[in-house]
């Protein structure tokens, strides 16, 4: 499950932990490397050390060589790494260019090409197709393995009038797409809490040309509106909506450890306690409003995705700077830029204008990178790291790539990832998406209600069906209790897992947190079991053992508080049922083994305790969108029973030549 270990290993910073290092001898010339694995960046404008997509992908290769071969590859910002020197290449601009680059990498002696970004798909579909025009290319590259990052190979690609451009059987390709909406959902929830706990700071609207608003506001933009970027944006909006319509609505019913007269200092400092205290004072918790980057458009009932795109992933994109400054003019409280290196533009503009605005990181834990800066008037921030980037929505490309390489090498699954012939899915459950560690302290246990709703007011039996349980049962109260979420010393796997499992249930009437049996007054023991359920029986047994052995909450071990926040969120976030999907707008067939796209207008929000596609005052729906995928929650075979390429015989080597 997603936890501290993942985040720390995903930050792009690694110490010299290998038992064998590559020793470099200076000779005044560019070093040439011979590697079984090469990275192919997304386009000719991309660079390796981008603090984002390309760099995280390269780190996956580094992680593989470090863990499996005890070899330390050069760091991504090393001057010894240049385009075409044997470790990474740019792909070219056309279909034929990309196929030629595949062959060049093969001629370098590489066995596996890690091809990143949606731009690679057409070439990969071509060389795995039955199209006679590409038969020679297919045969030439048949013994080369490919990992397609941030997309999926389709059996029928680009279907127009029922005729596909390519029919593909990817015997030598393993792909991975990411449920980035899951990770950014967590980030949206944490952002809403972070802004509220720092209300005084963000309501000053420093740096704004119009600072009269007393709203906490957020916005975001993408570089190009493609499935992988829209997934981030819509998941973030859903997390904000979850705070507005569920957490905000039911906060007065929250049961906290302080309600049980706990003397724990950690309990008194927990975010749930602090939010309840705010509700009881003159300073009220605020719902979070979404504003448009377009000037003068905030009163419109509809939003356009066209106003939320910069048009490229260039680090110098002028439209990105315009979008950022438009939002700063409006006094926006937080921005999530899903546009690669353009997060750096956002940080620099906030610093230049001394704006009281948070920038939410994307892909890696960007709050730890050197692009981050101290927040203007940082001492006025009560909570958080006092930086412009407080935390990030993680898409752990490095974790996925490392696991896929290991799966290919050994010819069997590795940590939920499969090898050639499969479309893999990066989820919270496979430790591939989530929120960075700095955001953990702002995640609220989603199961915090203490009273039972009447049958007439019970919530719908879908995603937000978090039934309020009876507070007179000791085990129920213990299971529902919000546990401290300090940045240090707290394991959040439990809560994320609960969220994940809630949404991975295939039945619309059964969830991990709100089982039908609970509404039938099931025993407290059974309720506790349901609430603390995690992905494996081992974890469930361990949790039960902790409670029985020391009489304390199941989240305590060796005097150090842990909790199950991550587990709960994980259960909430990956439901395969159509009604519970975060981003589904067309009814799923009973066969969920396919990738589906929708171009319907709008995106999902939570309204009135239900997950629906409708407008709300705070988050109007997008009136114009682009295709985004609804992914299955586990790897899917796309080779129709054919025999995939065997990678166990690859060299799996790296050396200087």
Curated annotation (Swiss-Prot):
This is Uncharacterized lipoprotein MG040 homolog. Residues 291-316, 468-496, 516-563 are annotated as: Disordered. The keyword Signal applies. Keywords: Cell membrane, Lipoprotein, Membrane, Palmitate, Signal. The keyword Signal applies. To T.pallidum TmpC. A lipid is attached at residue 27 (N-palmitoyl cysteine). One of its GO terms (cellular component) is plasma membrane. Its main location: membrane. Transmembrane segments: none annotated. Residues 1-26 form the signal peptide. A lipid is attached at residue 27 (S-diacylglycerol cysteine). PANTHER family: ABC TRANSPORTER GUANOSINE-BINDING PROTEIN NUPN (PTHR34296:SF2), TRANSCRIPTIONAL ACTIVATOR PROTEIN MED (PTHR34296). It comes from Mycoplasma pneumoniae (strain ATCC 29342 / M129 / Subtype 1). Residues 469-495, 526-545 have a biased composition (Basic and acidic residues). Residues 294-304, 516-525 have a biased composition (Polar residues). It is found in: Cell membrane. It comes from the Bacteria.
